[in-house]
From Swiss-Prot:
Organism phylogeny: Eukaryota, Metazoa, Chordata, Craniata, Vertebrata
Name of encoding gene: COX6B1
Annotated protein name in UniProt: Cytochrome c oxidase subunit 6B1
The UniProt record lists the keyword Plastid: no
Organism: Macaca mulatta (Rhesus macaque)
SUPFAM superfamilies, alphabetized: Cytochrome c oxidase subunit h
Main location: mitochondrion
Length: 87
């Protein structure tokens, strides 16, 4: 049973697709941009009263590309008001 769950997860796993804005091997900027895009989208949709689920694509991409420690640090910085990005 557990083996089937793992196989299903592997089969359904999707990583970040190619983005022509970031053609180089180093994907740091891609990670950063998708993190910002997710939170900008979430903020805009919340303000307009729209469906926030349309922003999930950005979240999946940055979670696929970014190291967990970076995301944790950025989330803490946003909570403290010291995040350097413009959201």
């Amino acid at each position: 049973m557990a083996e089937e769950d793992i196989e299903t997860k592997i089969k359904n796993y999707k990583t970040a697709p190619f983005d022509s804005r970031f053609p180089n091997q180093n994907q740091t900027r891609n990670c950063w941009q998708n993190y910002l895009d997710f939170h900008r989208c979430q903020k805009a949709m919340t303000t307009k009263g729209g469906n926030v689920s349309v922003c999930e694509w950005y979240q999946r991409v940055y979670q696929s590309l970014c190291p967990t420690s970076w995301v944790t640090d950025w989330d803490e910085q946003r909570a403290e008001g010291t995040f350097p990005g413009k959201i």
